[in-house]
Amino acid sequence: MSSAKPINVYSIPELNQALDEALPSVFARLNYERSYALLDAKLYIGYSIAVVAGLSFFLDKKFERDQIVTYQKLLVGAYFVLSLLFWYFSRFIEKGTVYVGKRRGTKEEIYVKTKFEKNEPLYLVELVQKKKGENSKKELKAKLEVNKVFNESGYLQNDAYFKWFSEQHNVLDTKKNE
């Protein structure tokens, strides 16, 4: 089975997008359900920043400057703190995670981070497996040559992609806890 739409296999951004978009279906076949907790947290922080900015604008339009200086100072401080929190969350907590999944029926979570380096057709994948309630954490870094999962016409071969991830997942399962 291949993807419905061909891509330019010489374009790293297109390769990255196509491979990242296929991750949910691959992990669904591995019995994982997508978790949106990181995305939800990032959205809450972002919406909070927008609310603070909107409230500041509203106060500026409705009241005289003398009446709202203290409130504006508080809102600017809140905006700064929320922006700093957003930056910290993006930089250190989320750090390039493109997929988070929870295995059905267990407390196991998997975090998938992907990237391309130096515009080479090597898809760098980092898998982090955690079990809630236990302090077990397993990590695996792997490289996928994209010509193994795309044909010459630019179609993603989903079965080959799934097989590669299945092999990596098996390696991760056999690793000892770190």
Swiss-Prot record:
Keywords: Endoplasmic reticulum, Membrane, Transmembrane, Transmembrane helix. Pfam families: SPC25. Residues 1-37, 89-178 are cytoplasmic. Its main location: endoplasmic reticulum. GO terms for biological process: negative regulation of post-translational protein targeting to membrane, translocation; protein targeting to ER; signal peptide processing. GO terms for cellular component: endoplasmic reticulum; endoplasmic reticulum membrane; signal peptidase complex. The chain crosses the membrane at residues 38-58, 68-88. It is found in: Endoplasmic reticulum membrane. Residues 59-67 are lumenal. It is a multi-pass membrane protein. Component of the signal peptidase complex (SPC) which catalyzes the cleavage of N-terminal signal sequences from nascent proteins as they are translocated into the lumen of the endoplasmic reticulum. Enhances the enzymatic activity of SPC and facilitates the interactions between different components of the translocation site. Present with 4890 molecules/cell in log phase SD medium. Belongs to the SPCS2 family. Component of the signal peptidase complex (SPC) composed of a catalytic subunit SEC11 and three accessory subunits SPC1, SPC2 and SPC3. The complex induces a local thinning of the ER membrane which is used to measure the length of the signal peptide (SP) h-region of protein substrates. This ensures the selectivity of the complex towards h-regions shorter than 18-20 amino acids. SPC associates with the translocon complex. Interacts with SBH1 and SEB2/SBH2. This is Signal peptidase complex subunit 2. It comes from Saccharomyces cerevisiae (strain ATCC 204508 / S288c). The lineage of its organism: Eukaryota, Fungi, Dikarya, Ascomycota, Saccharomycotina.
